């Protein structure tokens, strides 16, 4: 079942972002059930009520049903989802034209010095607009920028040093603010630089890809890759705010857009069945970049992510469930070489493998397997790993996965009806071996 999916073919492989269409112990076995809408805590019976009430939706959401034709988005008051972490809580602003609303960014700047970290693809599109948003009506603020090469293959210590070099050469002090302008790679590296520079400085996320907007910019995971494993070096470090200007998706290549949808689909599978069913009905609108549909999908994804992070910031339990498909997927990214497959593409293939293993364990029925395959295909994502991956490659790479404890690989698997999952190391090894053999060469 190895994949013939080719990076140079489908609208689908790393953060080759915008081009104009031109160690805390984790419990061994955590069962999680998350029913229906995140925005209605009273209807959710799978989480502790105290935890669910933490999620604050501070503005009106996008229309839920997308049967009508799309309407042109324009600058307006953003939807706001808050990540509740006590004194370190922060808002996620979501909407069109937000980079044209300077106050949203300026209220979160510390001091008078700002360093914008971006890449060679995003800089020509949005760097000037971002600098204007940071300085408009605020002449006391000075902005430096560092433009990094674009791609997952550059998410390493050598590239990270360029950020530190610029900060030190510019003599930035502890009251400066780092701003991440780009996709997940830029957000992860800028966040890690902010966590490390002078032992921690202010940090703002401006994600410009679907992947970053619905997942990586929220929750404070920062870091870089190591040749032996993805995201092995990093820190938990929360931003002051996340500003999601949905207009930035207008310049996102189709392949990058599809990659981000893998994380959107994940939320529905592990904790939000209603959202998954909505995606099944509205995937064509998402692929067509319908602004109303996309705003809703981003908002709903951020609500799910914020809810989990507010309960388990440092992944000591329930937050691990957000890694559905990631253990197999990270093995693919590492095995084929960083940058060959996009993160979402690898996660999609990994999700199919996790679902296959869940079925082999007798935890889900065939109909759910088929629904997962269908929605990923609709999203133009791969449903099996590349042909070059072998069983031994999977095993050796997954042996150093961050979720390994006491020599046991723990996985996120589906169990029961749609929207239910389990994070566990208590499974029949035979099922894992059978899945690996089914999807890769011996």
UniProtKB/Swiss-Prot annotation:
Catalyzes the second step in the shikimate pathway. HAMAP family: DHQ_synthase. NAD(+) binds at residues 119, 150-152, 155, 183-188, 208-209, 221, 230, 248-251, 305. This is 3-dehydroquinate synthase, chloroplastic. Induction: Up-regulated by elicitor. It is found in: Plastid, Chloroplast. Its EC number is 4.2.3.4. Homodimer. One of its GO terms (biological process) is aromatic amino acid family biosynthetic process. GO terms for molecular function: 3-dehydroquinate synthase activity; metal ion binding. Residues 1-61 form a transit peptide. The keyword NAD applies. A divalent metal cation binds at residues 263, 326, 343. Highly expressed in roots. Lower expression in stems, flowers and cotyledons. Barely detected in leaves. PANTHER family: 3-DEHYDROQUINATE SYNTHASE, 3-DEHYDROQUINATE SYNTHASE, CHLOROPLASTIC. It comes from Solanum lycopersicum (Tomato).
């Amino acid at each position: 079942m190895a994949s013939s999916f080719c990076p140079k073919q489908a609208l689908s492989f790393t953060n080759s972002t915008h081009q104009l269409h031109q160690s805390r112990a984790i419990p061994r076995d955590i069962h999680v059930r998350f029913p229906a809408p995140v925005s209605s805590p009273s209807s959710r019976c799978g989480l502790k009520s105290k935890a669910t009430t933490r999620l604050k939706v501070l503005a009106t959401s996008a229309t839920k049903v997308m049967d009508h034709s799309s309407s042109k988005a324009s600058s307006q008051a953003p939807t706001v989802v808050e990540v509740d972490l006590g004194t370190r809580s922060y808002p996620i602003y979501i909407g069109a034209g937000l980079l044209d609303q300077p106050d949203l960014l300026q209220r979160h700047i510390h001091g008078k010095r700002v360093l914008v970290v971006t890449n060679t693809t995003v800089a020509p599109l949005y760097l000037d607009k971002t600098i204007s948003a940071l300085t408009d009506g605020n002449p006391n603020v000075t902005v430096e920028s560092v433009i990094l090469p674009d791609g997952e293959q550059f998410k390493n210590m050598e590239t990270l040093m360029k950020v530190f070099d610029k900060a030190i050469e510019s003599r930035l002090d502890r009251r400066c603010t780092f701003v991440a302008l780009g996709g997940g790679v830029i957000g992860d590296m800028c966040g890690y630089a902010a966590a490390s520079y002078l032992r921690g400085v202010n940090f703002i996320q401006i994600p410009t890809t679907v992947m970053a907007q619905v997942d990586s910019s929220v929750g404070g995971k920062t870091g870089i890759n190591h040749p032996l494993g993805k995201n092995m070096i990093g820190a938990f470090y929360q931003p002051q705010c996340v500003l999601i200007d949905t207009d930035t998706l207008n310049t996102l290549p189709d392949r990058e857009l599809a990659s981000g949808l893998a994380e959107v689909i994940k939320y529905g599978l592990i904790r939000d069945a209603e959202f998954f069913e909505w995606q099944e009905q509205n995937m064509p609108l998402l692929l067509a970049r319908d602004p109303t549909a996309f705003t809703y999908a981003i908002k709903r994804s951020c609500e799910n992510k914020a809810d989990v992070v507010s309960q388990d910031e440092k992944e000591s339990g329930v937050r691990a469930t957000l890694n559905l498909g990631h253990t197999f997927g990270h093995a693919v990214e590492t095995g084929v070489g960083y940058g060959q497959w996009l993160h979402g593409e690898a996660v999609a293939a990994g999700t199919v493998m996790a679902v296959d293993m869940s079925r082999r364990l007798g935890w889900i029925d065939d109909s759910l397997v088929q629904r997962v395959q269908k929605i990923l295909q609709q999203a133009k994502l791969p449903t099996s790993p590349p042909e070059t991956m072998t069983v031994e490659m999977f095993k050796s790479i997954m042996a150093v996965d961050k979720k390994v404890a006491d020599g046991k690989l723990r996985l996120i698997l589906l169990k029961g009806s749609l929207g239910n999952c389990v994070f566990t190391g208590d499974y029949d090894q035979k099922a894992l071996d059978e899945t690996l053999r089914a999807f890769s060469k011996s």
